[in-house]
């Protein structure tokens, strides 16, 4: 008799957010990101914009302007990383406070 392998349930890659929306769709994820942490997409857009302006300056042969925009890119990228790290810490703190509210009797 042949052995049959056990049926393994599928892995769910995303969970519904606190508002109940499923974040599997790209538009849902973007809306969630813009609503919860708006500085991250703004920083990403600033980074890309600075890089595009630097590229345009290089094509025109304006190396001083290109260097200035590359510096702006580094600043925008650093601000974005700080926003990500700050968002992680804030979210962790909010989860801890929520957990403490559930544990602490009123």
Swiss-Prot record:
It is found in: Mitochondrion membrane. Pfam families: HIG_1_N. The keyword Mitochondrion applies. Signal peptide: none annotated. PROSITE patterns: HIG1 (PS51503). Residues 9-102 form the HIG1 domain. One of its GO terms (cellular component) is mitochondrial membrane. It comes from the Eukaryota. Residues 16-27 have a biased composition (Polar residues). It is a multi-pass membrane protein. Residues 1-28 are annotated as: Disordered. The chain crosses the membrane at residues 39-58, 73-90. The keyword Mitochondrion applies. Keywords: Membrane, Mitochondrion, Transmembrane, Transmembrane helix. Belongs to the RCF1 family. Associates with the respiratory chain complex III/complex IV supercomplex. Cytochrome c oxidase subunit which plays a role in assembly of respiratory supercomplexes. This is Respiratory supercomplex factor 1, mitochondrial. It comes from Schizosaccharomyces japonicus (strain yFS275 / FY16936) (Fission yeast).
